[in-house]
């Protein structure tokens, strides 16, 4: 299918087949579509609503074209979300990655610089002194030896350069916001994925099932956060053993006080880094509580504990023992030596 035919199809609110979406994505990723065509297609898809088949097909193309990182073995997990929730919180999932690593997980943290927030995962890690642009072999060593490595999206998905200009010019959420957490170059089987709207909870769980994932928690909080929140109920769509179940959790279930997420907002990368460091140093705060919740979910997704509740307890334990901040220090040292 050529790009103009695809545009005519989606603007009449007809869905693309998996094969058609694959063809169109290959055209976009190879630079054969103009910025206007890319923007038009993304708007058309959003207006009609992207399907599980379309998203999975697009993700497969990006995975196939990505510069891959090869890691194997148990307890592999990623904590990448879609972003776009507008809350401007500090980097919760990034802080969580170090807690999960300290708990025995192996985290392939996929991320990028900020698109819609004050500070992306790449921004805060770079500010901490972590070198972002490593070879796939160096990243694999980080994960194997330290339990955590950062996969800087532009280094692995060079073909998305053709989409950057139209996405920035449009300034709205598109298919590519959904693709970030679906296209980890290490093909991680277990994930915690935060989404910007509850309409995507079960669909993204099924997309990840189609992509071969095994244990996934797709989360969205009632206060709008694309993380497990301390300010409201959080809905979770859990993929496990080929089935998806949906349920709600509250911070009180885990002995955590409910606090407005406005207390977690930041205005700069440095402010986000300061909070991340305080959390990893186990300073009591709402920030530490929300990291414990989200790290606990990833510990559970990585199959290190049999329940989410035990995952949160394990997260709090490694924080109290100072092991999470040791992982941050180790990653800084390792990457600076590369």
UniProtKB/Swiss-Prot annotation:
Q: Which InterPro entries match?
A: Anthranilate_Pribosyl_Tfrase, Glycosyl_Trfase_fam3, Glycosyl_Trfase_fam3_N_dom, Glycosyl_Trfase_fam3_N_dom_sf, Nuc_phospho_transferase
Q: Catalysed reaction(s)? A: N-(5-phospho-beta-D-ribosyl)anthranilate + diphosphate = 5-phospho-alpha-D-ribose 1-diphosphate + anthranilate
Residues holding Mg(2+) 1: 93, 227
Record keywords: Glycosyltransferase included? Answer: yes
Cellular component, GO annotation: cytosol
Q: What pathway does the UniProt record associate with this protein?
A: Amino-acid biosynthesis; L-tryptophan biosynthesis; L-tryptophan from chorismate: step 2/5
**Which amino acid positions bind anthranilate 2, per UniProt?**
167
Describe the family membership recorded for this protein in Swiss-Prot or TrEMBL.
Belongs to the anthranilate phosphoribosyltransferase family.
The record's Pfam families line, in alphabetical order, gives:
Glycos_trans_3N, Glycos_transf_3
- Annotated 5-phospho-alpha-D-ribose 1-diphosphate binding lies at 81, 84-85, 89, 91-94, 109-117, 121
What is the name attached to this protein's record?
Answer: Anthranilate phosphoribosyltransferase
Q: Which residues bind anthranilate 1 per the record?
A: 81, 112
One GO biological process from the UniProt record?
L-tryptophan biosynthetic process
Protein source organism = Nitrosococcus oceani (strain ATCC 19707 / BCRC 17464 / JCM 30415 / NCIMB 11848 / C-107)
Phylogenetic classification of the source organism:
Bacteria, Pseudomonadati, Pseudomonadota, Gammaproteobacteria, Chromatiales
Q: What does this protein do?
A: Catalyzes the transfer of the phosphoribosyl group of 5-phosphorylribose-1-pyrophosphate (PRPP) to anthranilate to yield N-(5'-phosphoribosyl)-anthranilate (PRA).
């Amino acid at each position: 299918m050529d790009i103009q035919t695809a545009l005519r199809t989606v603007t009449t609110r007809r869905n693309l087949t998996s094969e058609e979406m694959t063809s169109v994505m290959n055209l976009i990723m190879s630079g054969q579509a103009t910025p206007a065509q890319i923007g038009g297609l993304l708007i058309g898809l959003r207006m009609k609503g992207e399907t599980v088949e379309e998203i999975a097909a697009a993700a497969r193309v990006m995975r196939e074209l990505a510069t891959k990182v090869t890691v194997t073995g148990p307890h592999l997990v990623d904590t990448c979300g879609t972003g776009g929730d507008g809350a401007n919180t500090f980097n919760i999932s990034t802080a969580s990655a170090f807690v999960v690593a300290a708990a025995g997980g192996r985290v392939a943290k996929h991320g990028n610089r900020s698109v819609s927030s004050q500070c992306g995962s790449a921004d805060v890690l770079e500010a901490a002194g972590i070198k972002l642009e490593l070879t796939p072999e160096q990243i694999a060593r980080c994960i194997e030896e330290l339990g955590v490595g950062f996969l800087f999206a532009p280094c692995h998905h060079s073909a998305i350069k053709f989409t950057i200009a139209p996405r920035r010019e449009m300034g709205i959420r598109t298919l590519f916001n959904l693709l970030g957490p679906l296209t980890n170059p290490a093909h991680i089987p277990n994930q915690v994925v935060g989404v910007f709207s509850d309409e995507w909870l079960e669909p993204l769980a099924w997309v990840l099932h189609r992509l071969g994932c095994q244990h996934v928690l797709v989360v969205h909080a009632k206060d709008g956060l694309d993380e497990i929140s301390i300010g409201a109920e959080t809905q979770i769509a859990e993929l496990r053993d080929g089935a998806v179940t949906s349920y709600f959790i509250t911070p009180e279930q885990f002995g955590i006080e409910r606090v407005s997420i406005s207390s977690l907002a930041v205005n700069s990368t440095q402010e986000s880094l300061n909070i991340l460091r305080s959390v990893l140093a186990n300073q009591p705060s709402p920030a530490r509580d929300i990291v414990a919740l989200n790290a606990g979910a990833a510990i559970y997704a990585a199959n290190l504990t049999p329940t989410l509740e035990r995952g949160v307890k394990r997260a709090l334990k490694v924080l109290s023992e100072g092991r999470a901040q040791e992982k941050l220090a180790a990653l800084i040292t390792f990457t600076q030596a590369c």
